[in-house]
């Protein structure tokens, strides 16, 4: 058995999971509704407050799909019940973030401001900047895949560089720093 796939998916209060035609799993909860098409070989059953996935054989393909879809469904359950939050810190002189509805406006040292239109499922807010601290962008959503994709897209605008650490980084992310060229000259 797959170590991940054999675990049951626990459903918190207020979360319902239903399997629709075409093997589409629909998860509803207080924070929204998500759906995921599951491979035809994987069977999804819901019994009370737990969901269970089974596979027909122990072929490597079935084993990998078993764990994959169990993890995806569990991420959907956590998303509609608790939600996901990603915080990103903008490190650099003059780096700023402004949120106007679903429009994200970033000042990242370019000659122009960068504007990103966020999907409707994602809510963004710029945390108030205290003196001496870097601006922080907070993204919230029920969809883990979508929020991760958007956060990676924002980070790719200015990846942190290894010498001074300037760029957009996730809060708590440890960057590999390098010594400058003066470190080797002795």
Regions found by a protein language model. Give the residues of each.
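N-terminal intrinsically disordered, cationic/polar leader segments
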Residues: 2-66, 70-186
């Amino acid at each position: 058995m797959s170590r991940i796939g054999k675990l049951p998916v626990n459903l918190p209060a207020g979360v319902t999971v239903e399997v629709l035609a075409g093997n589409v799993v629909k998860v509803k909860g207080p924070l929204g509704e998500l759906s995921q098409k599951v491979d035809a070989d994987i069977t999804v059953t819901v019994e009370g407050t737990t969901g269970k996935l089974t596979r027909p054989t122990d072929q490597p393909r079935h084993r990998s799909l078993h764990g994959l879809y169990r993890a995806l469904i569990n991420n959907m359950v956590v998303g509609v019940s608790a939600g996901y939050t990603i915080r990103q810190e903008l490190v650099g002189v003059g780096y700023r973030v402004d949120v106007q509805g679903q429009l994200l406006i970033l000042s990242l040292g370019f000659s122009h401001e960068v504007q990103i239109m966020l999907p409707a499922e994602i809510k963004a807010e710029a945390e108030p900047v205290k003196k001496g601290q870097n601006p922080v962008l907070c993204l919230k959503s029920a969809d883990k895949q979508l929020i991760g994709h958007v956060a990676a897209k924002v980070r790719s605008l200015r990846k942190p560089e290894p010498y001074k650490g300037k760029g957009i980084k996730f809060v708590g992310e440890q960057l590999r720093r390098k010594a400058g060229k003066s470190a080797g000259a002795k």
